[in-house]
Each structure stands twice: as C-alpha cells, then as structure tokens.
C-alpha cells in the first residue's frame, strides 16, 4: 500500500507541474482533464502526508523514550506514544478507503424519478414531500435542480410521478443510496378517526448518460407530441410542445414538458432516454460482478423497502443499516447528510471486506 501511495504522490507532483505551465490552459479539454485528475488525487496525498508525519513522529518518540532518563519526561513521552499508536491505525483505515476504486458513474449528474405507489392520495402527497426534500438537499449542496416532467394527482399538491434533473459535483455518488421504496406512516388530513395510514413511494436515481455511453438508432424510436399541462405561458394547452419518446426494442418511455419549445423538450427527453438505457447497461455490468458491492446499499434495489418515515414518532429509519433518527422535520427539509454519511460508511466497509476476499 505504501508503494502505491508514494506513486500517487509523485503523480500528484507531476500534475502540479503540468498545470503550473502557462501553456497548459491553451488546450482547455486537456487542462480540465488534468485538473480533475489533480483534484481527485489531492485528498489521498493529504491523508498520506498526515499518515507519514504521524509515523515519523511515533518513531522519533520511541527513540526519545529509549534515551530519556527523567521519569516525568518518560511518562509524557509514553502518553504521546500511546496517542500516536491509537491515531495511526485510524489514518491507515482512512487511506484504505480512499484507495478503493471509484465507481465510474459517481461523478455523473442524475435523473431522479419519484412515483407514488400504494396508498392512493397519501402516496401522491408523500411523493411531493420527497420531491421538496431532494430539492432542498440539492440547494444545500449547491447543486442545480430542475423539474423535467410531472403528472399531478387528483389531490391538490400531489404527484403521481415527477422527474428531476440534478447537476453538480459527484451527485450520483451521493444520491445513489436514495433508490428504493420509501414508506410513510402518518394520519391523513382526511382521516376522522385518527388512524395511521401506510403509503409508499418509489425513487429511482439514475446516473445521467453521455451521448458516447449509449448508441440509440433513430429507427428504434417513436416520437409523440402533446399539449403540456400545469403552469406555463401562452402555449399551455394550445400548442403541442411536450414530447414523449418510446424506445421500441425495450419499451422504455421518456417525456419532457417543462421547456418552452418542442425542440428543447425533445432534446431533454432524449437525454432522459439515454440515461434510462445507460442505467440498464450499468445494472447488467453490476450483475456480472456479483460481489459484495451488490449489497442493497450500493445497488439501491428498487423492489426493497429502504426507509420508513414515521410521523407520529417523528422517526426516520433506514432499514438497510438500522439507522434511526428522530429529526423527521429537519430531514424533510433536506437535512439528509447524516443518513447519507452512514450509508457511505456502510458501503465502504462492505467494499473493503470485498477487497480482502
């Protein structure tokens, strides 16, 4: 491991020299690639430097303990050695995690599909609650969140389905743990007996595909146009600006109605279709690996109930890792970081174990 870390540090220094060259920015594509590689290695190098400095300090303290004759001084040095011995394995574990291979899709932007499941109107209202939760979390992260498509329910404020686009730094690597079935337990406003109802909403987080990822043949597509609904300008319900694309071989459908023109909606719908096909391709690759990374946390198995939101007890439970929080209002306001951090740690532990097998 230490040889690998030293090699990474040397690579980081080489990249730093290349980026400091005044001519480096002339080729913007190459410059961005080098800069990303440099940024990706920075955290590993900083952790390695801290590990190396701690190890050096420990060695020096041990030497000092051997040569020291003063009893009080020896006691101080021994206390320092004990502290450093405790710190070193923690730093080593951190380095092992940082050296784990990154998932290629983690740096991608995402498409989030939220669909009301069992529970009727309550499920539709909870789909809207989850939508706001993700929009606020994206805002906290400094990401850009955009609504691409929605299908309102009969109850005001609810969604049968809604699709979001989220752009930013390492969005998929952060949001992929949200894929699955989210269950809510609460008393509906229309419930006169005070009984708790259980509803469910499915969430699919898809890494956004690039044009080079998926080959789509024009003859495999069917294009339909229709009038957009909901809020809008003069074109609403007058001009067919909304676009629906069907991929005939798979039956996958994507639609967009939020852009102003039919051309813009067509481009966004094509991007969504590409993303859905890429997700299938990615899932097939993951299936072939069939290792511990296929745990529920990493795959976001959409047939599984991953989380329960219990309103009477103000409790959120993630069933994959037995995580429980009694901060339901804050979580619904987008404060998801504690849950996501816990899921990431569980994922990293599973992947480290897989590396040892």
Swiss-Prot record:
Q: Which organism is it from?
A: Pelodictyon phaeoclathratiforme (strain DSM 5477 / BU-1)
Please describe what this protein does.
Peptide chain release factor 1 directs the termination of translation in response to the peptide chain termination codons UAG and UAA.
Listed PROSITE patterns: RF_PROK_I
Question: Belongs to which family?
Answer: Belongs to the prokaryotic/mitochondrial release factor family.
Residues that the record marks as modified (N5-methylglutamine) are 234
Q: Show the coiled coil region(s).
A: none
List, in alphabetical order, the Gene Ontology terms for molecular function in this entry: translation release factor activity, codon specific
Q: Name a Pfam family for this protein.
A: PCRF
Tell me what this protein is called. Peptide chain release factor 1
Family annotation (InterPro entries): PCRF, Pep_chain_release_fac_I, Pep_chain_release_fac_I_sf, Prokaryotic/Mito_RF, RF-1
Q: Which UniProt keywords apply?
A: Cytoplasm, Methylation, Protein biosynthesis
């Amino acid at each position: 491991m230490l040889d690998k870390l030293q090699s990474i540090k040397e690579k980081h220094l080489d990249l730093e020299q290349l980026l400091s060259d005044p001519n480096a920015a002339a080729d913007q594509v190459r410059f961005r690639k080098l800069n990303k590689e440099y940024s990706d290695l920075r955290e590993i190098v900083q952790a390695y430097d801290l590990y190396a400095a701690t190890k050096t300090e420990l060695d020096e303290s041990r030497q000092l303990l051997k040569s020291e004759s003063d009893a009080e001084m020896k006691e101080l040095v021994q206390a320092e050695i004990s502290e450093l011995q405790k710190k070193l394995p923690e730093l080593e574990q951190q380095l092992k995690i940082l050296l784990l291979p990154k998932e290629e899709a983690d740096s991608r932007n995402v498409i989030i599909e939220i669909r009301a499941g069992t529970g009727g109107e309550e499920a539709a209202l909870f789909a809207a609650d989850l939508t706001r939760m993700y929009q606020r979390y994206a805002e906290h992260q400094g990401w850009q969140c955009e609504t691409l498509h929605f299908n309102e329910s009969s109850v005001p404020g609810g969604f049968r389905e809604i699709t979001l686009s989220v752009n930013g730094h390492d969005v998929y690597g952060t949001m992929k743990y949200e894929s699955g079935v989210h269950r809510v337990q609460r008393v509906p406003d229309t419930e006169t007996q005070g009984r708790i109802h259980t509803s469910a909403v499915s969430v699919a987080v898809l890494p956004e595909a690039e044009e080079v990822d998926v080959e789509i043949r024009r003859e495999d597509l069917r294009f339909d146009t229709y009038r957009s609904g909901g809020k809008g300008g003069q074109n609403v319900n007058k001009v067919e600006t909304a676009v629906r694309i069907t991929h005939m071989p798979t039956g996958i459908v994507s639609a967009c109605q939020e852009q102003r023109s039919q051309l813009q909606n067509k481009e966004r719908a094509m991007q969504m279709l590409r993303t859905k096909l890429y997700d299938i391709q990615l899932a097939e690759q993951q299936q072939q690996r069939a290792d511990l990374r296929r745990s529920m946390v990493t795959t976001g198995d959409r047939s599984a109930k991953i989380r329960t939101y219990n309103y009477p007890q103000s409790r959120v439970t993630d069933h994959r890792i037995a995580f429980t929080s009694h901060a339901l209002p804050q979580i619904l306001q987008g404060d998801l970081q504690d849950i996501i951090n816990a899921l990431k740690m569980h994922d990293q532990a599973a992947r480290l174990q897989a590396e040892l097998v």
